[in-house]
């Protein structure tokens, strides 16, 4: 009962935060964009029995007990995943985050991968220490089941050139690494400067 109540509190906290802070869902993608898709396989009957009505609106086949069992055994529930887990994006390209699953997910930038804000899932997935960014509810964007959110544009202040880590703050094993690449002329200039300095 403790687990059931605890999970339910967390889920409804997430829905409340989503209502306050989420961007508008259903945003159309544009040509040349980069999509990150989030998947799960929640069985609505068993997930809603534990988490409350509406927690899972999908037609997945993994029961709640099977989900917890797989996570406990392997520290990963494979059907709960980001795709791709790693990607390269050129400066100027927009990103979009699509939730193809039946549960709410987040796509949160973190300095280092860690746990989320659901202590039970942190523990059994082997991520006991939450990523600090996952405890800052005011900045977390919740992506509803079936929703699409506008992500940062590569090369912007939110996604500059370099390597960036993103994770779901509910299911912290759902992770993506984005490598933002400089335009060819910038990369060529940087290489030339490095070679020039190496000769001095």
Model-derived segments and spans:
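Bacterial N-terminal signal peptides
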Residues: 12-22
